Swiss-Prot record:
Pro residues: compositionally biased ranges: 431-440, 510-521, 868-879, 981-996
Species in which this protein is naturally found: Homo sapiens (Human)
Protein name, per record: Zinc finger MIZ domain-containing protein 1
Domain notes: The SP-RING-type domain mediates interaction with SMAD3 and SMAD4.
Known role: Acts as a transcriptional coactivator. Increases ligand-dependent transcriptional activity of AR and promotes AR sumoylation. The stimulation of AR activity is dependent upon sumoylation. Also functions as a transcriptional coactivator in the TGF-beta signaling pathway by increasing the activity of the SMAD3/SMAD4 transcriptional complex. Involved in transcriptional activation of a subset of NOTCH1 target genes including MYC. Involved in thymocyte and T cell development. Involved in the regulation of postmitotic positioning of pyramidal neurons in the developing cerebral cortex.
Gene Ontology MF terms: SMAD binding; SUMO ligase activity; transcription coactivator activity; zinc ion binding
Subunit structure: Interacts with AR, but not with ESR1, NR3C1, PGR, THRB nor VDR. Interacts with NOTCH1 and RBPJ. Interacts with SMARCA4. Interacts (via SP-RING-type domain) with SMAD3 and SMAD4 (via MH2 domain).
Cross-link Glycyl lysine isopeptide (Lys-Gly) (interchain with G-Cter in SUMO2): where in chain: 91, 834, 843
Biased composition (Low complexity): 128-141, 479-497, 1040-1067
Localization of this protein: Nucleus, Nucleoplasm; Cytoplasm; Nucleus
ZnF region ranges: SP-RING-type: 727-808
Effect of residue 287 to T: In NEDDFSA; uncertain significance
GO biological process: androgen receptor signaling pathway; artery morphogenesis; cellular senescence; developmental growth; heart morphogenesis; in utero embryonic development; positive regulation of fibroblast proliferation; positive regulation of Notch signaling pathway
Record field: compositional bias (Polar residues): 413-429, 881-895, 951-961
Length: 1067
């Protein structure tokens, strides 16, 4: 049997032992804590251990909620494993998800109140002074009770998994329980559980008296301190954690380094070598360590990796020391480590530097004294280390690979010395002398048991800024804010980024990003399980990571621009559903294909909208009962309810979604069976982009406007006899007075528009109209109250020309005669004064005939609207997707000028890529296609009722519209060129109405029953006629992976039958 087989066998034997202990309430906590530590390393989830691990987890899922066991700890354990479900077989992964959700539900019910009582500002790792004192060793040596005491640097058991504990940093796991590296046998190399012979483990055994202290030895005997002799449970270390730079005393894994004789921060002499246990196993582990080093370096820690990749800040810390390279999240120590004296060189730099002997063996160097590059000023005072260094040759340099940045819970490990305070230049390789030496307790571990250190419940402010190695945000909560002044090594250039607030306090205890956790009401002081910054929810780094530093994820400029909301055809992901009566917590799962997730992240105009509405509201206006709280993937979301029931806003989830499985957890304190919930894909173009699209596609040429006005004159004369258009009695209608003020804002119209079916000449301001319909759009003309859906709007070039001609004057009205000649009506103080044609006014303002007018330059106007789609040089406003965007150059996503996409148009995909239909209009497919598609009249009467449907609130109805028209905005669709194309706007959702598109094709597929939209979740119930549930399938998309293809109804029906929903993996 080779060493690896032996290691596997020993590990499985240990797991079997833990399984037995998990069934006993007296040993459950210790056993679960050890297992949680072990699961902190991704290697724990290798197939050779799966069967044994699942046996343990099966027991946890069964007993955790029983009396005498620890539900919170059991949930965290399952959550950590569930976050790595991709490493399990499908069957095991399904069991994990189910267990995790079940325990999460029970945990919420049991601890909801208590969680909210935690003070919000409390740092996760700050134990109260009293607790620190209680941590005093009960054994003969100071570390006696270490293993299970809640040491300052350990996480409290009741701490949400979101907060990372010290032990977590290297392995990238959040060990939320009080697991300690030292106390935890898992850190002991002797322990078979060290997969791959944890690099740390090796020096820990024989050479490190500190680790092998009786306590460790005792691991084989029984839990020291806490576990009385009567307790047989043996806690063995499973995966020791690698050293933390500069953490001078973490026994095995920290600066003291596994090898450090006094690894626990206790003088070596206090721990007799006699304590060494299983030297042979240790040796084997050490041997494996070298082999595992490579794997370790590249391994990705569940949480840590996510954090890292998410912000990409820490891809690597620049070389900290001449020899230091941080490559992976695990510090791989290359080979067996001999006893490294606890000497001050544990800091990363020193480790990398090779731990010069002088630094190692001599007494700790003063902070101000120069020291060899490799020696860390704090070397000696690592956590819990006595201030002196114990001489001990440091066998070799331990390159620290990639030190993970600390999480909020673990403020700083080593490296404290580098910071502005420490005078270490931020430059990577050098750490000039820092401040005067002082016993550095590692700020992070309050109350460390360092002899010289006062045990304060808090993390003493580090003298140095760790900024350069750690993200400042992590230290937000602490008084010592690390300015992060220099991540000098931060390759990412995050360097002086102001610390992001650590939302820690608001995150409910949620063990793993992907797992639903009982949502604590936002505001609870529980730190997020995963990340200090709510950045990352997805447990696995998505292809494209949205950077969501703020709870509401909106894209960067998301708040800068107003957006319209239109449901996308066949875009219902979770059909409208009710909650079970009196069910306090319910989980609703949906899946996103990686390609769909990527597209959502790329396009700022696409969103996953989750809303609640009253079951009797046909318009499906958003209405959230006061008792409802929503959490997605364990991230609580804030619901905007506004001042009244008409101002409620739907939730947008894409920023908290992840590829694959996603869980929406709804918590209610009172029954809300009268409401329905629906999750759907919506198109949210910015008002600006819609304006640009309308200008390009729905500009009614002056000659058409004139024809329409003349027709109105004749029809009015015929229908109302001698009544003028304005309703005035007169001989014969010789002129019409038209106000230049918008009936919505009562200000001068900037861009005159009216609905396609409107018979009046009076216009309203297009931008004001779009803004009016942003939230709960009714899409009704403010002049005649007829339905004026987005696709049916027309920009009147003739009126626009009049406005331009007198833009610098203060006229409020103009008169237009039957020949369409016009002149301004002077503002009269005396109403009795007639507007005599021969009078001064007439002389000053001549009547202008259409032929004399200079029409406005549409392209200039479009460009003036700002970042337009590619067609125009200006990039569209980030927040909005200009129709241009879509149209942008026809198909180019124009760099997403309007999108918030961080990457711009991802992959350079052109809009075309997304749209199947050929762009019919001059503007690429966007509008035109959709519009055209839209154009085809929808058959559903509902649409009329739903004109607003276009609005976000009426997603379904709008969906209808949106469906066919999925991107009205993107299409700017209304702009379809067919000015005359009679739209069936009323029936069609706003976007489809006019489009002459019909002419282009009457996609019947576009039609889709609003109700169906409502219910048809993936829709595809298919029949647009079906009352509610059915959604029309999209015309076949040639490439179902092109999420957007479904968005724009193609000009030509495609032959593929994929519905949008097909893009979403349903359970």
């Amino acid at each position: 049997m080779n060493s690896m087989d032996r290691h596997i066998q020993q590990t499985n034997d240990r797991l079997q032992c833990i399984k037995q202990h998990l069934q006993n309430p007296a040993n459950f906590h210790n056993a679960a804590t050890e297992l949680l530590d072990w699961c902190g390393d991704p290697r724990a989830f290798q197939r050779p251990f799966e069967q044994s691990l699942m046996g343990c987890l099966t027991v946890v899922s069964r007993v955790a909620a029983q009396q005498g066991f620890d539900l919170d700890l059991g949930y965290r354990l399952l959550a950590v494993c569930a976050a790595n479900r991709d490493k399990f077989t499908p069957k095991s992964a399904a069991l994990l998800s189910s267990w995790c959700e079940e325990l999460g539900r029970l945990l919420l019910l049991r601890h909801q109140k208590s969680r909210q009582s935690d003070p919000p500002g409390k740092l996760p790792m700050q134990p109260p002074l009293s607790s620190m004192s209680s941590m005093k060793p009960t054994l003969s040596h100071s570390d006696g009770s270490f293993p299970y005491d809640s040491v300052p640097w350990q996480q409290n058991t009741n701490q949400p998994p979101g907060s990372l504990s010290v032990v977590t940093t290297v392995w990238g796991v959040t060990n939320t329980s009080q697991s300690q590296v030292l106390g935890n046998p898992m850190a002991n190399a002797n322990n078979p559980m060290n997969p791959g012979g944890n690099p740390m483990a090796s020096g820990m055994t024989t050479s490190n008296p500190g680790l092998n202290s009786p306590q460790f030895a005792g691991q084989q005997q029984q839990f020291s301190a806490k576990a009385g002799p009567a307790q047989p449970y043996i806690q063995q270390s499973m995966y020791g954690r690698p050293n933390y730079p500069g953490s001078g005393g973490f026994g095995a894994s920290y600066p003291g380094g596994p090898n450090a004789p006094a690894g626990m921060g206790i003088p070596p002499h206090t721990r007799p070598p006699a304590d060494f246990t299983q030297p042979a196993a240790a040796a084997a582990a050490a041997a494996v360590a070298a082999a595992a080093a490579t794997a370790t370096a590249t391994a990705t820690a569940t949480v840590a990796a996510l954090q890292e990749t998410q912000n990409k800040d820490i891809n690597q810390y620049g070389p900290m020391g001449p020899t230091q390279a941080y490559n992976s999240q695990f510090m791989n120590q290359p080979g067996p480590r001999g006893p490294a004296s606890m000497g001050g060189s544990m800091n990363p730099a020193s480790m990398a530097a090779g731990m010069t002997p002088s630094g190692m063996s001599g007494p700790p160097m003063g902070m101000n004294q120069p020291r060899p590059p490799g020696i860390s000023p704090f070397g000696t005072h690592g956590q819990r280390m006595p201030q002196q260094t114990y001489p001990g040759p440091r066998p070799q340099s331990l390159p620290i690979q990639n030190i993970k940045r600390p999480y909020p819970g673990e403020p700083n490990y080593g490296n404290q010395q580098y910071g502005p305070n420490s005078q270490f230049p931020t430059q990577p390789g050098q750490y000039p002398a820092p401040n005067p030496p002082r016993p550095l307790t590692s700020p992070n571990y309050p109350g460390q048991r360092m002899p010289s250190q006062p045990s304060s419940g808090q993390y003493p402010p580090p003298t140095v800024n760790m900024g350069q190695y750690y993200k400042p945000e992590q230290f937000n909560g602490q008084n010592n804010t690390f300015s992060g002044s220099s991540y000098s090594n931060y390759s990412q250039g995050n360097v002086n980024r102001p610390p992001r607030p650590v939302p820690v306090a608001n995150y409910p205890h949620s063990p793993v990003p992907g797992n639903p956790t009982p949502p604590m009401t936002p505001g609870s002081s529980i730190p997020p399980y995963l990340s200090p910054s709510q950045d990352v929810k997805p447990p696995f780094p998505p292809d494209i990571k949205p950077n969501m530093s703020a709870l509401p994820p909106p894209p960067a400029n998301h708040n800068d621009e107003l957006r319209l909301t239109f449901p996308v055809r066949d875009g219902v992901v979770l059909e409208p559903f009710r909650l079970e009566h009196n069910l306090a917590v319910s989980n609703h799962v949906f899946h996103l294909r990686p390609t769909v997730h990527q597209t959502l992240m790329w396009r700022s105009d696409l969103e996953l909208q989750f809303k609640c509405y009253h079951h009797e509201d046909r318009q499906m206006n958003t209405n959230w009962p006061a008792s409802v709280q929503v959490s997605v993937n364990a991230t609580p979301l804030t619901i905007e309810r506004g001042d009244n029931k008409t101002s409620h806003k739907p939730l947008h989830l894409k920023h908290v979604c992840q590829p694959g499985r996603n869980t929406i957890q709804i918590t209610v304190t009172a029954c809300c069976c009268s409401h329905l919930f629906v999750l759907q894909l919506v198109h949210r173009p910015s008002v600006r982009s819609v304006l640009q699209g309308l200008l390009k596609k729905r500009l009614l040429p002056a000659e058409h406007c004139i024809t329409k006005i003349k027709r109105n004159f004749s029809s009015v004369a015929a229908s109302s006899g001698n009544t003028t258009l304005n309703g005035e009695d007169g001989v014969e209608q010789t002129a019409i007075k038209v106000s230049l003020k918008c009936p919505i804002t009562f200000r001068r119209i900037q861009l005159p528009a009216r609905g396609h079916d409107c018979k009046h000449v009076q216009c309203f301001d297009l931008e004001s109209y779009l803004q009016l319909n942003c939230e709960r759009g009714t899409w009704r003309c403010p002049v005649c109250n007829k339905t004026a859906l987005l696709e049916g709007l027309e920009v009147d070039q003739y009126m626009w020309g009049i406005l331009n001609a007198i833009q610098h004057s203060e006229f409020e009205e103009v008169t237009i005669d039957p020949t369409c000649s016009w002149r301004p009506v002077p503002i009269k103080s005396d109403l009795h004064i007639k507007d005599d044609p021969d009078g001064i006014p007439s002389k000053r303002f001549k009547t202008m005939s259409p032929s004399q007018m200079i029409m406005p330059n549409v392209m200039e106007m479009i460009a003036a609207l700002g970042p337009g789609p590619s067609p125009y040089p200006l990039p569209p406003p980030p927040g909005g997707t200009n129709s241009n965007d879509y149209s942008s150059q026809g198909n180019n996503y124009q760099g997403h000028g309007n999108f918030d996409f961080p990457h711009g148009n991802p992959g350079g995909t052109s809009m075309n890529d997304f749209m199947h239909g050929p762009p019919q209009l001059s503007h690429p497919p966007d509008m035109p296609n959709n519009m055209a598609a839209l154009e085809k009249p929808l058959s559903h009467p509902m649409q009329e009722t739903m004109p607003h449907a276009g609005s976000s609130d009426q997603p379904h109805p709008s969906i209808q519209q949106g469906l066919h028209v999925p991107h009205p905005s993107s299409q700017s669709g209304p702009p379809l060129h067919h000015s005359g194309a009679p739209p069936p706007p009323p029936s069609q959702p706003p976007r489809q109405p006019p489009q002459a598109a019909p002419s282009s094709h009457p996609h019947s597929d576009l039609t889709f029953n609003p109700s169906s939209a409502l219910e048809g979740q993936a829709g595809a119930q298919g029949a647009s006629d079906m009352p509610e549930p059915s959604l029309d399938l999209l015309p076949e998309l040639t490439n179902p992976d092109e999420l957007l293809s479904y968005l724009d109804p193609p000009d030509l029906p495609s032959n593929s039958n994929d519905d949008l929903l097909s893009l979403f993996e349903n359970n």
